[in-house]
């Protein structure tokens, strides 16, 4: 559960309505893989991840980034029940994929940076603070199975 004020919730929702999920998803996942190269081990089947350009232009990275942001969108629609919303994904990432839960926090922070880059002055300190709460809540929900 994420505790947002009415203003914060409105700001998150308003900005998210302008997000190009295809573009931002691929960019966020790509940046995660470039900045934290050890995360690439979870994506062996994605082909060429040998350079930043290869990662950022990889169609499988872009497609999976879109899928990740689709799940994030579901979370935004269920902020009062993030653990329930992400229960299956938490189980998958814990039991089958063995993804360290810290990676969820890293991806959330990268997503905030990508949103700031795309929205510039519209991504005010107040909007950033609200999004930090949301990505922390999502990361916590995804890590729930690990506890």
UniProtKB/Swiss-Prot annotation:
Q: Which residues bind heme b?
A: 64, 93
Q: Where are residues bearing Phosphoserine located in the sequence?
A: 45
PTM-bearing positions, type Phosphothreonine: 13
Superkingdom of the organism of origin: Eukaryota
Classification via CDD domains = Hb-beta-like
Q: Mind telling me which Pfam families this protein's record contains?
A: Globin (PF00042)
S-nitrosocysteine modifications at:
94
Q: In which tissues is it expressed?
A: Red blood cells.
What are the UniProt keywords, alphabetically? Answer: Acetylation, Heme, Iron, Metal-binding, Oxygen transport, Phosphoprotein, S-nitrosylation, Transport
Q: Which Gene3D superfamilies match?
A: Globins
A GO BP entry: hydrogen peroxide catabolic process
Quaternary structure and interacting proteins, as annotated: Heterotetramer of two alpha chains and two beta chains.
Q: What does this protein do?
A: Involved in oxygen transport from the lung to the various peripheral tissues.
**Full protein name:** Hemoglobin subunit beta
The gene is HBB
